[in-house]
Amino acid sequence: LVAHHRDRVKITAVVVVSCSTGGKVPGIAQRVAKKSGLPTDVLAFDVNAACSGFVYGLISGLSLCQPGGAVIVCAAEAMSRLIDKTDRNTGCLFGDGVGAVLLEDRPAFREYNWHAGCDGDRVDLMRGEIGGGITLGGMQVYDRAVKTMSDTLNRLHDNGIKPAVVVGHQANSRILQKIREQVDAGDAVFVDSVEQFGNTSAASIPLALGTCVADRSIPATGRMSLVAYGAGEAWGGVSVDYDLTDAIALHGS
């Protein structure tokens, strides 16, 4: 991604999102910046907000965008480190993956908007740690995921700007379908890549976008709404203009 855009824009920041690093120091972002050949004046930092991490990374990255510059937001997850493979309830749900996007402030782009938050009183609904497995609060998580993401999208669309594409955290196809039924998004394409990748936590949204780029299943330009809900009951959504005419399907799992 850096090589593809190096001659066109100056990359000023790198945001790497992950909940599966094990808390290593230094962070991944500094290593990504070095291996990508970026200059030493680039801002680089990690974000951990579990399944909402990519949306949080986007909010951070968009706030750092300046005319003539660009920000890379990358999500990398190795959920195989966290799952208990003997647990039939969760072991089969999660996958590993990585995806990245490049953000720019272009004159033609309308102002983005976002809405996010968390409820620390509900931290026990979803938990995970390396070697300790993942625990989920069953139907309570399902119900709250549907309500929270639906409410967030409807709030994002209150300004009257309807998206061409909606990409939710790819945790469960039934959740995505329920959100689709409850959100006023006009004729927007609702992306679902759960069957292909499973739940890749923070990497699920960029992986889904990479699939759309590869199969050209969404318009090349327009407005996009992205939304997520996850552990710590962290949640968030972003509505932003996009341009995929020069995009490359650089993703993996």
Can you annotate each of these PLM segments?
Residues S20, F45-S52, T90-C92, I130-D151, ...:
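Active-site pocket-shaping loop/turn-to-helix segments
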Residues S20-T21, P39-D41, V47-G68, A164-S253:
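Claisen-condensing/thiolase-fold acyl-transfer catalytic domains that form or cleave C-C bonds
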Residues V17, N48, I72-E77, L103, ...:
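Short beta-strand segments
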Residues L1-T12, G128-A164, R174-A185, A208, ...:
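Conserved active-site "lid/cap" helical segment
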Residues L62, G68-G95:
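Flexible, glycine-rich active-site loops centered on histidine and acidic residues
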Residues K24-L38, A70-M79, D124, I175-G186:
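Acidic-glycine-rich active-site phosphate/pyrophosphate-binding loop
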Residues K10-V15, K34-N48, S80-T86, A185-S193:
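Glycine/charged-rich beta-loop-alpha catalytic/anionic-binding loops adjacent to active sites
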Residues K85-K147, N154, Y229, D241-S253:
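Condensing-enzyme catalytic core mediating Claisen C-C bond formation in acyl metabolism
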